[in-house]
């Protein structure tokens, strides 16, 4: 087994989990699945078990970070691991490079209709496929169509994408310009219906599109075979880099270092205020993936407290860049004594077109099958009332074709969060100083220090690992 990059981070947690892990082992002849999403419980109970009544399956659901800690500690002991593991995107490469998965042989023909990025992201160092995903998770910009009409005079998807500059070279510049226009048009006394509208609820919604669309991930291999910390220029270099957009959105109509009037609502990403904004009239849009339509927007469109309901007032269009967010891959552990049965279960969930079609129809999930999704996209009768009758499958199918999945690394779970923290600090001139040039260097250096602390044994750092123009 290869050296685990996460050993140092999890050694303390291992002592806390020893007694708990002893109770988590496999039971008899059951196939054991560990997952962070309760979707798999439904998929097993309502679909797989009905089609495969002779196969007993035990699904154990954990919070995503707790699952990562549990898996890491089980890997250290080599015991108590499940047969099948559901992996969230940010942990995918870590587990693959830890070499704990069995290659999934003989399925390449059946996976031909999957989106390329889901395949590319889940190959081991020998180029063998070790995990498959049942869903694809293209990201887009969900926006309020009533606000677009009232504040911007926009009545069509095409007009919205032109205003955003979607997939154009200057797309983030147009995004910031739109944020400023929304603020102007909704200023006090300007509009009777919508006042003080912000383009986003939380500024760090922009992180995922930047991370997904960058050319290089957090590490590249040098001639000596070492992993070298890499900060893609799109994250920090020049106008409308990720750090620069953070600054512009958080400064808003103010001045750097002397008071800010942000273009965002300054909520905390995926906390209560962020969800509450989905039912209010203060936020214009959200950068979300396909699954968030059903699990986030629909679930929070009606406020219990105020009675306000934004259902039917949303549309979805291309974001400034093509990106993906999250997703779930399934893999067979190489410690399993039920590898054949486990692979058949994964084949059912990711390649059985009857199941995938039913699942997509029943849940609205955007599934990892081009043939089925293209049929949904072309169906004139298929529309989403929540999106004012829009057929969102056509848009998601187009976005998913643009993704490649080649920039994921073992470091993503920690370094994505760390860089986002310093991007926020830089945009608010918090802990970095309020002189623009030195603040940028301080933010980058602070991030580099955090990376060195987290991965001192597995990540080489040049001095410095960035180039300022």
What residue ranges belong to the model's regions?
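Hinge/lid segment of periplasmic solute-binding proteins
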Residues: 87-143, 149, 306-318, 331, ...
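Extracytoplasmic/periplasmic substrate-recognition and gating elements
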Residues: 301-374
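Extracytoplasmic/periplasmic solute-binding protein
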Residues: 126-135, 139, 168-232
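Positively charged n-region of N-terminal signal peptides that target proteins for export
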Residues: 1-7
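Conserved N-terminal structural module of periplasmic/extracytoplasmic solute-binding proteins
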Residues: 6, 17-93, 109-112, 155, ...
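Conserved C-terminal helix/tail region of periplasmic/extracytoplasmic solute-binding proteins
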Residues: 374, 380-388, 393-469
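Glycine-centered hinge/linker elements that transmit conformational signals in sensory
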Residues: 176-180, 222-270, 310-315
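Short helices/loops that flank or line small-molecule/ion binding pockets
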Residues: 68-81, 98, 148, 174-186, ...
């Amino acid at each position: 087994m290869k050296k685990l990059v996460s050993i140092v981070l999890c050694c303390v947690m291992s002592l806390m989990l020893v007694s708990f892990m002893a109770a988590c082992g496999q039971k008899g002849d059951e196939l054991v699945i560990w997952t962070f999403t309760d979707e798999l419980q439904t998929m097993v109970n309502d679909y797989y078990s009905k089609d495969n009544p002779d196969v007993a399956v035990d699904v154990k659901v954990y919070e995503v970070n707790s699952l990562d800690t549990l898996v890491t500690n089980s890997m250290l002991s080599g015991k108590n691991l499940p047969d099948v593991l559901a992996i969230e995107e940010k942990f995918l490469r870590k587990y693959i490079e830890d070499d704990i998965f069995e290659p999934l042989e003989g399925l390449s023909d059946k996976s031909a209709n999957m989106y390329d990025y889901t395949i590319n992201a889940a190959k081991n160092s020998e180029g063998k496929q070790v995990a498959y995903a049942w869903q694809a998770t293209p990201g887009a910009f969900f926006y309020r169509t009533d606000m677009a009409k009232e504040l911007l005079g926009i009545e069509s998807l095409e007009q919205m994408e032109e205003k955003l500059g979607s997939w154009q070279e200057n797309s983030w510049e147009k995004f910031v310009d739109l944020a400023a226009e929304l603020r102007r048009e909704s200023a006090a006394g300007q509009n009777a219906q919508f006042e003080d509208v912000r383009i986003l609820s939380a500024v760090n919604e922009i992180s995922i599109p930047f991370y997904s669309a960058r050319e290089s991930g957090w590490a590249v291999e040098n001639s000596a075979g070492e992993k070298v910390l890499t900060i893609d220029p799109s994250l920090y270099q020049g106008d409308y880099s990720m750090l620069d957009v953070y600054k512009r959105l958080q400064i808003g109509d103010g001045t750097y270092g002397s008071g800010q009037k942000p273009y965002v609502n300054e909520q905390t990403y995926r906390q209560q205020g962020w969800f509450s904004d989905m039912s209010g009239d203060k936020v214009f849009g959200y950068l979300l993936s396909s699954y968030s339509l059903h699990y986030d927007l629909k679930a929070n469109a009606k406020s219990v407290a105020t009675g306000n309901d934004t259902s039917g007032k949303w549309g979805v269009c291309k974001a400034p860049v093509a990106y993906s967010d999250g997703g779930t891959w399934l893999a067979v552990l190489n410690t399993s004594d039920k590898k054949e049965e486990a692979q058949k279960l994964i084949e059912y969930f990711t390649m059985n077109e009857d199941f995938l079609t039913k699942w997509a129809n029943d849940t609205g999930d955007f599934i990892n099958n081009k043939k089925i999704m293209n049929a949904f996209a072309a169906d004139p009768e298929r529309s989403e009332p929540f999106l004012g009758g829009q057929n969102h499958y056509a848009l998601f199918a187009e976005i998913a074709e643009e993704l490649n999945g080649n920039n994921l690394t073992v470091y993503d779970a920690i370094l994505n969060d760390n860089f986002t923290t310093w991007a926020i600090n830089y945009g608010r001139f918090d802990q970095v100083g309020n002189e623009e040039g030195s603040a940028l260097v301080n933010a980058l250096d602070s991030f580099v220090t955090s990376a060195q602390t987290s991965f001192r044994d597995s990540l080489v750092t040049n001095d410095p690992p960035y180039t300022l123009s």
